[in-house]
Every structure is written in structure tokens, then in C-alpha cells.
């Protein structure tokens, strides 16, 4: 062993010498020596006194389900660890006698003596409980641990909190819940998706059990695709994003499903005004294997014929999961999701869209310090449109096949390494047009399929430098290949858009050549450094800072915020460059009165390169030359976020405020070209200057629980015509610069009450949820259109609103 140590020390010393030599004497850049410096920082902490490791898995005693985010703490050393996404933890400590504390919100805490003179495997099963005095004491240590972690701009919501927040039609909803967090908005009622810190919908990486979800909305954006009964853990990363995530430039919404109860059978569900849900779970092999199956469906369309309405709008989805624990070191998981939305008008129009995923994962514990997860993932998004009155079916979509292998290496109590590799293969179908009847008059058409591959590798260290200073630093290397296709357009001077200086507008260029059976069309390689730090001011407050660069190689081609937009994903290539983000954030975090209250304040700045913009009059539907409709610009967003929370007591909740700007700029490519808005900065479609949200939960007693939330937002940017002209008897509206007007401000108050009666039948437990959405019946504008009054000939504005006041009742049950 001594010989190995001598050799290692020699190579380490030589590496240090060569690194400083290249930096100081040869004046090479820091970028070229990034990995050497990272190694240098790590190695200072690897050698020391004799240490031993405790490791294991923490589960729920009731279901054997692993628990994410459990705190394992040694208060004497102010050291601790947190269980990962599969309930595994590892903590390396000097030899000695300690107190070991295990704490997780909603569960009984464990405090026991620990005599550490050898490596130990310690598994724990936690019992559900209400808060006790011991829990408060241990929780103080937990909060001191969390406030010094080098992680910022992240929000977590439990399934219980999501179910308490009153939303439209009484259905608990993930997306509607995160809209109450600072920095998160959407385009308004009836709009799909969500926007984070001024970013677009397609700039969010949405993961369900590691599989990509391309559209997060059901039923015009009124519901999300996530069944709240099936959710185990949810985190939203808005900045300081860990190196293991990539492919999007705005945020990461990472959701894990429950695994299923391997001890006994259970079922729970709910019956609401427009939808119902049911989830069943139980053991396959007791204490070793479990299953979970959950489904939801809406049925409001069944009542429309009673009102002589010949339309339909409904959704359904299915969640399923199997797991098998072979032994303490090997576990296998198979999970999937399938969802569809259907919207039809009479028999002439039918719109169908939805996601599907399947994921096979293998967990393996190599040692008490090394954990791994191998995932094989398939996901797709389908969009279909049946226009019977025209006589054709339109289909489009995107599929991907993903292989990823992730490792978590717990070197010692100061350093945790994460590293891994990921490869995603994409297949794009822009459009397939098929006539659906003999007299259609529509010719069959297939737009060119596109193919791409995205490879990435990353490494990251979480490093406790001292009692006060903690760092997380890492690097992600991504490589994107635009693969060959059957036909590809080539343009003169590689410009797919021409500028007409007489008309002062952009027009699609005519291809000078169409290549067939092409080889690789383009490759892009990007280094994506990530860094964040936390400095502990005292036991209850800290200062944090972060920087991250991210690359996005997929583009959502859509110039509408409509609830069922005709969205098409396109890969980067010779004419569509990848988006690149640089984000900086600073924050101050404070806990008050043993974490009864907490305050989080952050400022951020985002700079985005190669942000797509559309020429005036862009034609995006069934266009095989989409590159002739878009321009490359840039974007920026900056702002302040404030979050004040009350975490304990009969009254709990939070107040969130965001002051921000989100802007785009698309200058001309030459001095002659005007670009968009004459090349000046203008508000993006996601710019909301002021965003205020408040949530309050009041637990009156064991029977009654009351909730309220309030939202106020600056109106969404929009375009109003400034004049009109006549052409061949038609009135044509004329517009000036983009997004210089706004819709009226948006505000809404929602209330709910939950009644949990005493259940005489202990087998079945139930609760009633009474909710009122939009209590004061404000008709918030979803859009404003203009028309000519037939009687007076004057122009008039027409406001379109989605919802007024909506009361609802839901019955939830479990057994």
C-alpha cells in the first residue's frame, strides 16, 4: 500500500507542477487546465487521518419505498449526507463515537449512538408521524445543513402540498402549483406549459423518471400530465443547474414516480367534477418486488350532448411501475407513462396529441462509496390533426432513444463526485399528410424525416472547503450530430432567407440544390461549465452564487401560445444553430426562529445566443423548408426573486414576488437589413414585469383544513393593429413593432376547504375537497382581437376570457 501511495503522490506532485507551469510560465488559459485544477482541488482533501464509512438505504416502514432527500447527520462534526434519488446515502467520518440523526419531514426521527471503528452498512426504515419536540431539535440541524449546501435557485414541492393548493375544477395539479413559485409564469389561462425566468416553454427540460416529456399539459393547459397520486419527488431547478442535466437552457423539472408498496396492497383515488383518478399498488414478492398502476380520465364531454353541443374535449393517462430488489446491491425498475388528449368540433375536426415513455433502470452499489444507475429510456410526442371537412389527416412527432449511465462517488465527508455519460438518438417527423377519403383532393405528402444524435459526458464535485465555505463545480461536454436525411436544401451563400430592401421584409430563399442521401450535415461541440458556492454567514444565514452554461440543440417551431398549437420540433443544423445560455445568480438565504420562517432572495441575469425569431408572415404549417421562416437572434432576462415562507404552525404558506424583464433582439445580418423591430431589443412573449403569488394553509383541526392562493401578474405582451388598409374588398390590419402593447393585468383568488370526517370504517379513509376558483369572478383576458362593427363601421376590441368563477367538489379516498 505504501508503494502505491508513493506512486500516486509522485503523479499528483508532477500534475500540480505541470498545471502551475502552464498557467504561469506558458500563460495557457484556465479553460485548457480546467480538469487539472479540478483534480488539484480534490486531491488536497483525499489524504488524511483514518476514516470509515457508513452507508445504506432509507425506506418507508409502511411500504418499503425508498425515500429521497432524507438527512443523515452527525451533529458533533456538523457533517451530514442526503439520500439520493434511490434512497442511498454514504458518509465517511473519522474514527470515534458520535450521535447519528436521521430526519425526514413527515416521518419519525431517529437518534442513536454510533461507535465508528470500521465500515458499517446501516439501513433505516422510517415510520410516519406528526411533529414532535425531538423532530424540531433535529430539524434545526437539518436546516443548518441545507442552508450551507451550494445549491440555489431550486424549489421542491411535496405531493401533499400540491394536493392542498386550490386549482381549477378542484383537481390537484403539478404545473399549476409551481406557477405559485417565484420566477415561474405561463402565458395565461388555457396556455400550455410554463415559463421560467423569462424563458420559452421549449427551454424547460421536463423529466418523469428520467424520461423526457415534450408537452406537459392536458386539456388546453388546464391540467398537467402528472398524476399527483403517483408522484414521489419533485424539484424545479431555475439556475445553478447540476452538470448531470443538459439539453435545455431555461430550467429542469425533475419528477420521480412512486415505486409501489412491497408490503401490502393499497388503493387511492378521487372523483371530481370533470375527471377521476385511481391508483393501485402492492407487492409482487413481499418485501422484494412491487407494482404501481395509476390512471386518470376526464368525462365532461359526456354531458355536452345534453346541452346540444356537438364537441368533445377529454384526456386520459396511465402511469405504471414495477421494481425488484435482488439484494442490497442490485435493484431493477421498469416504469412507463402514456397519455392522450382529444379535442373535436362536430365531425369535421379532431386534434389528438400526447406523450409516451418507458424506462428500464438498474441500480448497482459497487461499494459503500460508489453508487451507479444505468437507464434505457424511450420517449415520444405525437401530434395528430384530422380535418374531415378538407379531407386529410396530419401527423407529426418526435421520438428519442436514450442510454445513460450515472455514478455517485462519495470520496469522503468533504467531497462527493458525480459523473456519467448520456447518449440520445432523435427521430423527427415534421409532417405526414394522408387523404382520409376518396374525394379528398389532397395528395399524400411526407415531409423529410430528420435524425440527430446528442452525446454528453459530465463530472461534478460537491466540495466542503471549510465550515463556512462549500463549492460545487463541474463540467459537461456535449456533442450534437445532425445526421443525414433523404433530401436537404442548399442555398446560395448558405442563407435560407433573403432580404428585400425595397419592401423591407424577409422572404424565403429558393434552394440552389437539393442533396439526396446526405451524410452528416453538421456537428456542434460545447463545453458547459457549472459552478456554485455557499458561504455560511452564521448558523441561520448564508450567501450563495452560481454560474452555469447550457446548450440546447432542439427548437420548438411555433409562433402561438394557443392551447393546442401545431408544434414541430426541429434539430440544430447548418441553418439552425444551437441555443447557448450563460446564467449568473446571487442569493441571500435566512432561517428565522428554528426555521419557523425562512427568506430567500435572488437576483439573476441570463444571456442567450442563437434564439430563434420568426419573419413577419412566417408559414410554419407543413413547411419542409422551415429554415426559410426563421432568423437567429439573442435574448436576455434579468430580475429579482423574493420568497418568504412560514414553515410551521397552524398557519403555513409563502409569499413570492418576482420583478423581471425578458427581451429579444434580432438585428439584421448586414447594415442594409432591418432585422426584427429595426434590430432593437423588445419584450419577449414571456415578459411579465411583476409577478406576485401567495399561498396560505390553515389547519383548523383534524377535520377541517383551509387553503387559499392569490395571483397577480403584469399583462402578457401582445400586438395590436395600428392601422388598416383595403385590398380587393378585404380589410387588412397593419402592425408596427412587436410586443409593444400588453393585455390587462391578470389577478385571481382561489379558496378551498378539505373535510376529513371520522371514518367509522378504518379500512377506507375519505375526504371532501370544496374549492372555488376565481372567487371574485374576474374575467381575465386570454386575448384581445379587433373587428369592424357591422352597424357603425367602427373598429372595436373584443376580449376573450376562459374562466370566471368555478366552484367544484372532489371526493378523495384511500384503502
List the model feature ranges, each with a label.
Residues 382, 427-439, 443, 481, ...:
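Surface-exposed extracellular loop regions of Gram-negative outer-membrane beta-barrel proteins
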Residues 108, 120, 137-242, 252, ...:
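Periplasmic N-terminal accessory/gating domains of Gram-negative outer-membrane beta-barrel systems
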Residues 221-224, 232-242, 251-282, 290-314, ...:
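Short strand-turn segments of transmembrane beta-barrel domains in outer membranes
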Residues 604-607, 626-722:
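Gram-negative outer-membrane beta-barrel transporters
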Residues 46-139, 468:
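Periplasm-facing N-terminal accessory domains of Gram-negative outer-membrane beta-barrel systems
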Residues 53, 272-299, 308-342, 350-374, ...:
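Transmembrane beta-barrel wall of Gram-negative outer-membrane proteins
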Residues 551, 703, 711-729, 746-750, ...:
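C-terminal beta-signal and adjacent terminal beta-strands/loops
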